[in-house]
Amino acid sequence: MEYTRETMQKMRREELKNIAISYRIYNGYHERPISKMRKSDFIDFIHESVTTPNHSPNTRETILQNANRQEGRRRGLRPSSDGNLRRENRHNEDVIVHFIPSPLSSRHSPISFRDTLRDFDARRRIDFGSSLMGGPLGLLDVVINVLNSTSLDDEEQHELNNEEFTGTIPTEVEEENEAHETVRCAVCLHNKVCVLFQKCKHVITCGPCSLRIKECPVCKRIVESSDKIRIFLP
């Protein structure tokens, strides 16, 4: 439907706006939004862009393409090489991680591996301008957090290596005595063991309890009175 200038002069602004939208016109002169244009300028722009019969088909196609580009920019789209609109990708999907050293490698300590991840993280944040969780390396933040919580800084590692040992190292005699103190009778769980069962070689009971049992508590082997030998542990 063709609209003359006189016809559009009699229309309300809302009706003119609907006409412009139907022709995909959202901006007027100098990319000014149609909602902010004066009515007379609004009518002139619509009349020149769409309703003038002198426009050739190529001119009309150009007008529609410009309108499509305006709509695309408004929706965050961009024109592609084939003329169609494509949504802009805010992340670079062609990321290739060429090398990340293994934390178990002999050439890289866990601390240097952590520093490498930090440097890579910083460079990637600059390249993408967004959080890592939205990109292909979404787990990198998790790895860095784990390393930060379990690894020591260089200064802390140096202090730990240079810290003097203030404890005591037990001797063999002390360890043996402590072991004897903890070996208790398997029957009463109170007295120290002091009886050797000669056949099975088990030392597992105290003197009073060995008189009341007829088999070894460990291997269940029959123990005669002649097989019970009292020993004295140091």
From Swiss-Prot:
<keyword id="KW-0862">Zinc</keyword>
<keyword id="KW-0863">Zinc-finger</keyword>
<keyword id="KW-0479">Metal-binding</keyword>
<dbReference type="InterPro" id="IPR013083">
    <property type="entry name" value="Znf_RING/FYVE/PHD"/>
</dbReference>
<feature type="region of interest" description="Disordered">
    <location>
        <begin position="65"/>
        <end position="89"/>
    </location>
</feature>
<feature type="zinc finger region" description="RING-type">
    <location>
        <begin position="185"/>
        <end position="220"/>
    </location>
</feature>
<dbReference type="GO" id="GO:0008270">
    <property type="term" value="F:zinc ion binding"/>
</dbReference>
<dbReference type="InterPro" id="IPR001841">
    <property type="entry name" value="Znf_RING"/>
</dbReference>
<comment type="similarity">
    <text>Belongs to the IIV-6 175R/332L family.</text>
</comment>
<dbReference type="Pfam" id="PF13920">
    <property type="entry name" value="zf-C3HC4_3"/>
</dbReference>
<protein>
    <recommendedName>
        <fullName>Uncharacterized RING finger protein 332L</fullName>
    </recommendedName>
</protein>
